[in-house]
């Protein structure tokens, strides 16, 4: 991008691009420098330039960018993948839920408020209370991608001064090349796009947690209105089927709820870059996304295998 725009020599841009396709930097080789510098980029750039063995071209590597530009842009490329995987899982879960909701739309069962019998509802209606919020989250993804999957290229203090008069065009073209969106500004200390993605993932995990909590109750001994599949065996009580999958989902939901608070605290940056806030984000955001992905994985299997116990539902209504 920079070479084509004349920000750096075109031949150097081509050489750097070609080298990036051929050179594989060993992550272990930059571990020590990452620990010393608090970020991997200085060691990565140094190792890459050494492997290039073309100092006349490698001198233009990382031109006009700062470590945070690299880290944040790479983060958004990973968030894009995470959202795609989540979208696929949500669609699979919704298919399973909609099939059951349609099949058992008229199957009566007791509704419960404060865990006590209330007026009758149906298994289809119960499933709809889980599926509709997931559908809402799914429908938000296109807007979320536009508003949050941003490129970062703003330089050391967020001013883009090192890129000269073509700074805006360089950022725009880089965004297009990577399939990201151009925020048209620096967002080094504005973690709004990160929070949007994390909040969306946390909300999905909470929706799944509500489903898991209800399934724990419905599969409990003495109620037995839903079976969950073949998992959850006990080593000493073979008659039991422990609700392992819904328990895991609820636990993940609880964990994400706490981490979300920490991530919001990490959005408070001092000056133009804040190491404490940045490091806190690194410790919380990956776990929010991974826990959300794990909850989706459990829910995908659970929604495909849970089975209503018709006789018990009917008997519970008297």
Residue ranges of model-derived segments:
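A helix-coil-helix interface module used to build multimeric assemblies
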Residues: 1-154, 160, 166-171, 244-248
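Alpha-helix capping and helix-loop boundary segments enriched in small/acidic/polar residues
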Residues: 70, 110, 114-125, 161-165, ...
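Acidic, glycine-rich loop-and-beta core segments that form the ion-binding/anion-interacting portion
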Residues: 169-257
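Generic, well-ordered alpha-helical scaffold segments in large soluble proteins
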Residues: 47, 51, 96, 100, ...
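A structural signal for small-residue-enriched, beta-sheet-centric alpha/beta enzyme cores
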Residues: 67, 164, 170, 177, ...
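Glycine-rich cofactor/substrate-binding loops
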Residues: 1, 32-38, 223, 237-318
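Short amphipathic alpha-helical segments with heptad-repeat character
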Residues: 35, 80-87, 91, 98, ...
């Amino acid at each position: 991008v920079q070479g084509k725009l004349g920000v750096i020599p075109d031949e150097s841009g081509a050489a750097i691009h070609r080298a990036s396709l051929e050179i594989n930097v060993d992550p272990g080789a930059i571990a020590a420098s990452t620990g010393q510098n608090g970020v991997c980029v200085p060691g990565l750039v140094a190792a890459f330039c050494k492997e290039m063995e073309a100092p006349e071209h490698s001198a233009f590597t990382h031109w006009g960018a700062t470590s945070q530009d690299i880290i944040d842009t790479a983060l958004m490329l990973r968030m894009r993948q995470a959202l795609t995987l989540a979208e696929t899982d949500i669609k699979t879960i919704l298919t399973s839920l909609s099939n059951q909701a349609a099949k058992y739309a008229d199957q009566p069962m007791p509704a419960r408020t404060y865990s006590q019998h209330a007026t009758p509802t149906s298994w289809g209606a119960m499933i709809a209370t889980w599926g509709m919020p997931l559908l809402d989250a799914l429908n938000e993804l296109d807007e979320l991608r536009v508003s949050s999957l941003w490129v970062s290229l703003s330089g050391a203090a967020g001013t883009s001064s090192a890129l000269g008069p073509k700074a805006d065009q360089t950022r725009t073209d880089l965004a297009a090349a990577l399939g990201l969106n151009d925020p048209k500004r620096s967002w080094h200390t504005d973690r709004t796009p990160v929070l949007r993605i994390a909040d969306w993932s946390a909300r999905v995990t909470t929706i799944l947690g509500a489903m898991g909590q209800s399934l724990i109750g419905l599969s409990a001994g003495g109620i037995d209105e839903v079976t969950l599949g073949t998992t959850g065996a006990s080593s000493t009580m073979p008659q039991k089927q422990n609700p392992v999958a819904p328990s895991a989902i609820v636990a993940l939901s609880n964990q994400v709820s706490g981490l979300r608070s920490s991530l919001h605290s990490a959005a408070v940056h001092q000056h133009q870059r804040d190491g404490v806030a940045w490091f806190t984000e690194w410790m919380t955001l990956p776990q929010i996304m991974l826990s959300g992905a794990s909850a989706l994985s459990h829910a995908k299997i659970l929604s495909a295998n849970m089975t209503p116990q018709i006789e018990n539902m009917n008997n519970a209504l008297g």
